[in-house]
Amino acid sequence: LPLTIDGITTDRALDYITLSFAFAVGQVMWGFANYIGGMIADKYGDEKALFLGIILAASGCFLIPFCDTTIEIVIAIGLLSAGGAGIAGLAVAMSAVNKKVPEKKAGLAFGVLNAGGSLGQTFLAPIGVIIIINFGWVFALNCLGILLLLTLPFTYFLKDQKVRKQSKIDDQKTDIYMMI
């Protein structure tokens, strides 16, 4: 997203300070959304948390070109894109991988996951610049949104057979039964 700043400030009625504020809100939201993503993953499953995060991040990418006011850009960048990226972040992805691989291969799986994320970031920036130069920032954001949506089918394979939905009351009942 930062690669599109010049295009946004040129084509929209937004200045650099407004965009900086939207990205600052996004940084706070991203950190907070990591916790939300973890809670969603614990209660409903990793695949649902990743699915929701991807949808939010993609919707933010698609909405950015239509933003003309501060509140609109803060919602698109700061809440939707960053919030979605936080919910579907590395912590939830690692949790999903941890449930799918044997314990002896967990280190390798985490390494591959981290390396894949770094490799993606390494290639996405120059490809994004090429797309922006040749086709414009709006097309680049739409490509990013589509790329995010293309990852949605992979969330199906992360579906956990058993999602724990125990409450504290259930845990207390179990403790009482164990004492008896």
Feature names for model-found ranges:
Residues 33-45:
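Helix-to-loop junctions at the C-terminal end of transmembrane segments
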Residues 87-101:
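Intracellular juxtamembrane helix-capping segments at the cytosolic ends
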Residues 55-68:
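C-terminal ends and interior cores of transmembrane alpha-helices
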Residues 113-163:
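Helix-loop-helix hairpin linking two adjacent transmembrane segments in secondary transporters
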Residues 159-178:
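Flexible cytoplasmic inter-helical loops of multi-pass small-molecule transporters
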Residues 72-88:
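Hydrophobic core of transmembrane alpha-helices in multi-pass small-molecule transporters
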Residues 27-35, 122:
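Residue-level signature of mid-helix packing/kink "hotspots" within the transmembrane helices
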Residues 13, 45, 66-68, 102:
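Helix-breaking motifs and short loop linkers at transmembrane-helix boundaries and internal kinks
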